[in-house]
Regions:
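Terminal targeting signals and extreme-terminal segments of soluble enzymes
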Residues: 1-139
Length: 139
């Protein structure tokens, strides 16, 4: 099954990362790269919301993790794992909002990448995060 960004009113130049069932169930999530910096997007659906009708914090954290890992692996089909993730919620987001992630690679080592991101809804920051991501060796 092909998952298309246009089906979620997301620009066509975004790509779907194939193979992560959890991300597809929560999102689906989409990405593009500006150099080595990821730009990510997902459209909030009803199943992403909590009892307050705002996006569940766990959904935002999962999307932040996706954004951070896209920066670490450079959008390639590389396996990575999150070693640590810190996040701060700054504002709510709601059903039908387009959540856009802007990631930044802070430092890239041989096996660890330090990354940060901000998530936006309606041009307002809703979450800030930073992480250490480990690059896994190819088998």
């Amino acid at each position: 099954m092909t998952i298309s960004p246009e089906d979620y009113d997301i620009p066509a130049h975004y790509k779907h990362w194939v193979g992560d069932k959890a991300e597809d169930h929560i999102g689906p999530f989409f990405f593009t790269l500006e150099g080595e910096h990821p730009r990510t997007a997902f459209r909030v659906q009803e199943h992403n919301c909590n009892a307050h009708d705002s996006v569940h914090g766990g959904v935002l954290m999962a999307f932040a993790d996706y954004t951070l890992c896209m920066g670490a692996n450079g959008g390639e089909n590389e396996s990575v794992i999150t070693v640590s993730l810190n996040s701060e919620f700054t504002a709510p987001a709601f059903k039908d909002d387009l959540i856009v992630g802007k990631g930044k690679v802070v430092r890239r080592g041989k096996s660890m990448v330090f990354v940060s991101c901000e998530l936006f809804a309606n041009e307002q920051v809703v979450l800030m995060a930073s992480a250490v991501v480990k690059l896994l060796k190819k088998r």
